[in-house]
Structures are given as C-alpha cells and as structure tokens.
Curated annotation (Swiss-Prot):
The lineage of its organism: Bacteria, Pseudomonadati, Pseudomonadota, Alphaproteobacteria, Sphingomonadales. It comes from Novosphingobium aromaticivorans (strain ATCC 700278 / DSM 12444 / CCUG 56034 / CIP 105152 / NBRC 16084 / F199). One of its GO terms (biological process) is translation. It holds the Pfam family Ribosomal_L16. This is Large ribosomal subunit protein uL16. Belongs to the universal ribosomal protein uL16 family. Part of the 50S ribosomal subunit. One of its GO terms (cellular component) is cytosolic large ribosomal subunit.
Length: 144
C-alpha cells in the first residue's frame, strides 16, 4: 500500500477540506480519467482497492497512472481507552481529495472498457466521481 517513506512530522491535524482542487484537474498522461466530485479523505486501502479493480478489468492492456498519494497520517486511539494521555497512534494514511481532482488515468484501452473499469473503481471509493476523456473524445459514452 502507498505511504510516505519519511515525513517532516509524525502526526497531523485533522483539518477540513475546503474549496475546489487548484492543481491536478486535467488529464496529463492518459486519454481517460476518473475525476472526484466531492471533498473527502481517501485512504491508501481504498486507492489500492480501486487500482486492483481497474487492473483486473483491463487485463494487462494499456497503462494506469495513480494521480493521488496518501500523505496524511490519520491517528486513532484504541477502543475503550480514556480520553487524554496524548494523541493516538497512526492507524492509516490518507489523501485529501478536493472536487475536480483527477484520481486515476488510463491510456491504451478502448473508451467503453476504460469507462467500465473506472465505474468498478468508483464503487471502491467513498466519493462521487465521473469519467472524463480528452477533448473531443466521446467513445467512452458508447456503452451508455
């Protein structure tokens, strides 16, 4: 699973996710992409589950890019532990995703296959998403 090798600080504030994504909103690598429509923290496990769903569906053809990285440590106290005594230990890593952010990109696969792969990946994610394509390409809409 994805996680940073080294961080400046061990633990992070919870924070809030405001506004729209400033960067990472356009397709840079592939012909098709999966774009986030809601703000949410996406965990490393969810990213990995979505990646597996895509790669299993496209069956080793084409190329996949993961455009988000889980760089935020999420801490949690154990069950039935009294409050106080410091912040809990790190439970998992997450990526803060804003609306408009491209999560995954695909290239070298037909449009309907990419759309189906992304719809399977979207089921593994806690946010609403949509499939986007390069300007003028509507072949991913053929299956609808």
């Amino acid at each position: 699973m994805l996680q940073p090798k080294k961080t400046k600080f061990r633990k992070a504030f919870k924070g809030r996710i405001h506004g729209l994504a400033k960067g990472g909103t356009d397709l840079n690598f592939g012909s098709y992409g999966l774009k986030a429509l809601e703000p949410e923290r996406v965990t490393a496990r969810q990213i990995e589950a979505a990646r597996r769903a895509i790669t299993r569906h496209i069956r080793r053809q084409g190329r996949l890019w993961i455009r988000v990285f889980p760089d935020v440590p999420v801490s949690k106290k154990p069950a039935e532990v009294r409050q106080g005594k410091g912040k809990g230990s790190i439970e998992y890593w997450a990526a803060r995703v804003k609306p408009g952010r491209i999560l995954f990109e695909l290239d070298g696969v037909p449009g309907p296959l990419a759309a189906e792969a992304f719809s399977r990946a979207a089921m593994k994610l806690p946010i609403k998403t949509k499939v986007v394509a390069r300007l003028g390409d509507t072949s991913h809409l053929a299956g609808e």
